[in-house]
């Protein structure tokens, strides 16, 4: 595997048992671009008989071995794209998904119209939602996140350090459990925020049989799976945050959810906040599935 062509061919073959042929070739291309520091167009026009530098060959060989064992590409590279950003990721955090990009785009659209300036991201994981919101809100006044996992906190902190270095904008991290927070009267998290945003664990454990080994064996189950006996428990707790004043009147709660429980989630969240105190709707993702709840908090004076 001394040349670009030889590595590309060999990598696609090694990955073919785990991925469809097109995806295997795409991964091989991504590895080469990362190792060589090339853009896609630079790799396309490069002489395919170009010898790979020794340090690149060693790195590519190690990465291919990791991928062959089923480790996700984003963990192997150490980063994942999210909208126009590139975020550090590691095995302790969920790999950002396209649906979550859609969620953030919806939030940013509303925030621009409403002039929202503060938010909290509950269960921040890698920090992808908070990072994109903090970078994208025109006039940011307060950015906060809540996370329980120590591994995730370390990853998010690294991403927020990078955000501060490039934009001067800061995100505050709080280590706490959502369920403990809603039962506490002394939480450190500020109240009266413009936005509450969350992509909590929402996969029912019985759905695991249909999931890929790459996800099940490598991504954190804490971030994937909802409680078996109460699969919408996180959403009920999020609704209680609204009820407890963490969201100001005129603010919005946005969540990503499991289409399987979409209607139930919407109705129970509306019930907890109070039907007369909010308007709530389900929105579909680009694949047509019910994927998001938007709850606008408008209590009567």
What are these model-predicted stretches?
Residues 298-301:
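Flexible, glycine-/basic-rich loop-and-beta segments that form/coincide
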Residues 99-210, 237:
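Conserved SAM/SAH cofactor-binding pocket of Class I
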Residues 202-234:
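Mobile active-site "lid"/loop adjacent to the S-adenosyl-L-methionine
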Residues 33-110:
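Conserved AdoMet
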Residues 15, 111, 160, 164, ...:
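Conserved hydrophobic residues forming the short capping helix/wall of the S-adenosyl-L-methionine
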Residues 228-295:
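Conserved Class I SAM-dependent methyltransferase catalytic core
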Residues 31, 70, 100, 129, ...:
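Residue-level signal for inorganic ion chemistry
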Residues 1-44:
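Non-catalytic accessory regions of SAM-dependent methyltransferases
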């Amino acid at each position: 595997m001394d040349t670009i062509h030889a590595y590309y061919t060999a990598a696609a073959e090694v990955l073919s048992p785990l991925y469809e042929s097109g995806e295997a070739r795409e991964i091989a291309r991504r590895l080469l671009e990362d190792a060589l520091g090339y853009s896609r167009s630079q790799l396309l026009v490069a002489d395919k008989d170009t010898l790979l530098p020794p340090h690149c060959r060693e790195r590519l060989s190690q990465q291919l071995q990791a991928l062959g064992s089923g480790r996700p590409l984003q963990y192997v590279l150490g980063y994942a794209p999210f909208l126009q950003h590139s975020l550090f990721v590691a095995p302790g955090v969920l790999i950002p998904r396209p649906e979550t990009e859609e969620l953030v785009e919806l939030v940013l659209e509303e925030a621009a119209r409403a002039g929202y300036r503060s938010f909290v991201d509950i269960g921040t994981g890698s920090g992808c939602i908070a990072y994109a919101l903090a970078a994208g809100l025109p006039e940011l006044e307060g950015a906060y996140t809540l996370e329980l996992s120590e591994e995730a906190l370390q990853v998010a902190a690294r991403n927020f350090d990078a955000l501060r270095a490039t934009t001067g904008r800061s995100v505050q991290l709080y280590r706490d459990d959502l369920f403990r927070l809603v039962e506490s009267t002394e939480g450190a998290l500020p109240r009266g925020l413009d936005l509450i945003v969350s992509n909590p664990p929402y996969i029912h454990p019985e759905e695991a049989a249909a999931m890929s080994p790459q996800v099940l064996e490598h991504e954190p189950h804490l971030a994937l799976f909802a409680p078996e006996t109460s699969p919408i428990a996180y959403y009920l707790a999020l609704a209680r945050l609204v009820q407890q004043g963490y969201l100001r009147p005129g603010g919005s709660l946005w969540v990503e959810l499991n289409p399987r429980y979409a209607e139930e989630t919407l109705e129970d969240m509306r019930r907890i906040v109070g039907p007369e105190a909010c308007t709530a709707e389900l929105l579909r993702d680009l694949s047509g599935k019910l994927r998001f709840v938007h709850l606008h908090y408008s209590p009567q004076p």
